[in-house]
Amino acid sequence: MKIGIIGAINQETERLKKIIHFYIEKKINTYKIYIGKFKSHDVFLIKSGIGKVSASIATMILIDLYKPDTIINSGSAGSLQSFLKIGDIIIPKKTCYYDVDLTNFGYTRGQIPGYPKEFTVNEKICNFFKKNADKYQLKYIKGLILSGDTFVRENESIKILKKQFPSAIAVEMESSAIAQVCYKFNIPLIIIKSISDASDNNATVNFKENIDIVSYQLSKFVKIILENLIDM
């Protein structure tokens, strides 16, 4: 299989590079791509940069140049629920934008015209991890993840998001944009996130302190996915 992997920042991609064999580095404009192998898979790891547009461009680069069979987005997220702890893994069932509002035209908050109100992801890997939970002994939480072009870092912002999206459990800045592109081109998408902060007034400091822990947790899950992707 040909597998594209997207991480937003250095800490996320550096960990992932260590599980790719014999990679070479290529640069497309400002985007770094690491091309290598994982067992029989051809792997294309790209550092997208932060935010929705950067993530969309990175996704299109992978699709245009390498025609991946599956894309994996791995990265950090801020918690919207008190039961989530630093380093917890989120495998979302759905993702949507929190900063899109066309409700005056009859659309659901977060919905782009011509697209579903939420993007469904991870159906196969949710079933896989459910069946193999004892084998791998890795805990994860399922739920809705929100995306937008703001690093959420205020208690008041959390209240607003929870009111607008009661079922959301975490928030970040790339996954819905990647999901929109994959939806358009009918490419299966796997999203794995790990909690770096509580999206509160201490979020900036906590993110910096915890990003290495988060990246380590993510790399473990991504490796398991790569090892078992054909069987999912």
Swiss-Prot record:
UniProt catalytic activity: S-adenosyl-L-homocysteine + H2O = S-(5-deoxy-D-ribos-5-yl)-L-homocysteine + adenine; S-methyl-5'-thioadenosine + H2O = 5-(methylsulfanyl)-D-ribose + adenine; 5'-deoxyadenosine + H2O = 5-deoxy-D-ribose + adenine
Any Gene Ontology CC annotation: cytosol
EC class: hydrolase
Binding site for substrate: G78, V152, M173, E174
Keywords: Amino-acid biosynthesis, Hydrolase, Methionine biosynthesis
Quaternary structure and partners: Homodimer.
Function: Catalyzes the irreversible cleavage of the glycosidic bond in both 5'-methylthioadenosine (MTA) and S-adenosylhomocysteine (SAH/AdoHcy) to adenine and the corresponding thioribose, 5'-methylthioribose and S-ribosylhomocysteine, respectively. Also cleaves 5'-deoxyadenosine, a toxic by-product of radical S-adenosylmethionine (SAM) enzymes, into 5-deoxyribose and adenine. Thus, is required for in vivo function of the radical SAM enzymes biotin synthase and lipoic acid synthase, that are inhibited by 5'-deoxyadenosine accumulation.
Protein name: 5'-methylthioadenosine/S-adenosylhomocysteine nucleosidase
